Amino acid sequence: KNHYTHIEMMPLSEHPFDGSWGYQNTGFFAPTARYGTPDELKKFVDECHQAGIGVIMDFVPVHFAVDYYGLKEFDGTCLYEYPNAAVGESEWGSCNFMHSRGEVRCFLQSAANYWLSEFHFDGIRMDAVSRLIYWQGDEARGVNGTTLDFLKVMNQGLKSLHPTAMLIAEDSTNFPGVTKPVDQGGLGFDYKWDLGFMHDTLEYFQSAPEYRSRDYHKLTFSMMYYYNERFLLEYCHDEVVHGKATILQKMNGEYEDKFPQARAMYLYMMAHPGKKLNFMGNEFGQLREWDESREQDWLLLDYPIHEAFANYRRTLNELY
């Protein structure tokens, strides 16, 4: 009905804290019980495939939850994490994987393969790849050669076992070759999120129309680098939480003024080269920020202005 080709699921591995949205895992081989049994997850993916919809899953190869019933100090010692807290603790308060250990690399490679093999996901989006390219994502600390090698080996291995699977990097750096094949010196991903496009376009449409003539570069700058990689354009979950406001609410002006601007922004996105990704709720003009503890405000579809916006987004998807 809405003409989507794929669904991307936020992490489905078991995790203790709802507020982590699944990005702080304890069970890398265990689907979370929040949504049912493993067999029910397989059935969901199968029914999506029967409807012509692919399913992509978020995978977290950077860090894991600090809960002691997970991987932390698994046998009383630091098996999976760094013993040095200065490098072992992530910015989210979780434990960084120690990728220099072969056993840790094999564990993560096996986990990624498990989701593709057992549940027939059509792709994996790897979270926080910038934290693997540079030491804890800090370019000033230099490239992390060990984790780059880990990414190359994992991507090559997954492609050899699942040639049609999409491998997507969430990466905010300018590191070259993220989407080039490994045998050509790249990291072996198929696509990379274009976070710069998202931030630039949102800033443009947040500004008052009378000042936008000085900000045209925010619409055009992406074409300066676009063909260096294979990009995926996204308006994602990170932009509709923690006081940032929803996509619709970011638009300049009063309530009624926001809709035509959001329509223009999405039309520009659809006309721009690259794959498209849109977080749930954006398609009908969600007004409240996303909160993992409640569902989206579907009642907004009873309002003509939101229904018309949803129909417009549906038409754009059909055109795409």
Predicted features and spans:
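A short, structured beta-strand-centered segment in the mid-to-C-terminal lobe
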Residues: 97-98, 102-105, 301-311
